């Protein structure tokens, strides 16, 4: 049995029973024939909310790239309806609009002064799969010593201990820092 959901439309706002407000576009009014409607069936309601979430997702993605989890959380926070947001995010992933692997690669390249430890922590927080993180950081591991050497030189005449602490905060491993320092000392001799 199909249930009808009571709605109120004021201007460009669709107000649900629970006082949740959905902002409507002119296209939504015509597509879903909303003029003078006081109720919606489940299927129409799902389609309407799906369409609204899709519009918001397009707008957000036009401004910048997002990780799947990041986009999903922002849409849920903005509009609600977690189950419908999940469907939209899956649809966008299938269409190639969301690609965690490419976004993670791009993020790692933009933050090249971070160590693998810090990058992996940030990427895990963003909801990137472990396989993707390990694959991306595998490429980064080879460059760690060189990055540390560059940072060490960049830090200049600062106190030895402070240089190490600064590099550790960027997510580099202590063992790698020691290797880089000894390598730099060997190069000086």
From Swiss-Prot:
Keywords: Cytoplasm. GO terms for cellular component: cytoplasm. GO terms for biological process: regulation of DNA repair. It comes from the Bacteria. Its main location: cytoplasm. The keyword Cytoplasm applies. Transmembrane segments: none annotated. Gene3D superfamilies: Winged helix-like DNA-binding domain superfamily/Winged helix DNA-binding domain. The keyword Manganese does not apply. It is found in: Cytoplasm. Modulates RecA activity. Belongs to the RecX family. PANTHER family: REGULATORY PROTEIN RECX FAMILY PROTEIN (PTHR33602:SF1). This is Regulatory protein RecX. It comes from Fusobacterium nucleatum subsp. nucleatum (strain ATCC 25586 / DSM 15643 / BCRC 10681 / CIP 101130 / JCM 8532 / KCTC 2640 / LMG 13131 / VPI 4355). The lineage of its organism: Bacteria, Fusobacteriati, Fusobacteriota, Fusobacteriia, Fusobacteriales.
């Amino acid at each position: 049995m199909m249930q009808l959901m009571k709605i109120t439309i004021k201007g460009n706002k669709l107000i649900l029973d629970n006082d949740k407000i959905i902002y409507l576009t002119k296209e939504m009014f015509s597509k879903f024939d909303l003029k003078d409607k006081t109720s919606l069936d489940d299927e129409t309601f799902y389609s309407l909310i799906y369409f609204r979430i899709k519009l918001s997702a397009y707008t957000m993605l036009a401004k910048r790239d997002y990780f799947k989890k990041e986009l999903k959380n922002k849409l849920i926070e903005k509009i609600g309806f977690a189950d419908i947001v999940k469907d939209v995010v899956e649809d966008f992933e299938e269409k190639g609009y969301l690609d965690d692997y490419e976004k993670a690669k791009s993020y790692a390249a933009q933050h090249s002064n971070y160590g693998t430890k810090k990058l992996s922590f940030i990427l895990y927080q963003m909801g990137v799969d472990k396989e993707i993180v390990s694959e991306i950081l595998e490429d980064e591991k080879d460059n760690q010593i060189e990055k540390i050497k560059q940072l060490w030189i960049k830090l200049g005449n600062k106190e030895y201990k402070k240089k190490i602490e600064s590099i550790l905060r960027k997510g580099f491993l202590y063992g790698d820092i020691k290797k880089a320092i000894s390598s730099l000392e060997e190069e000086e001799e």
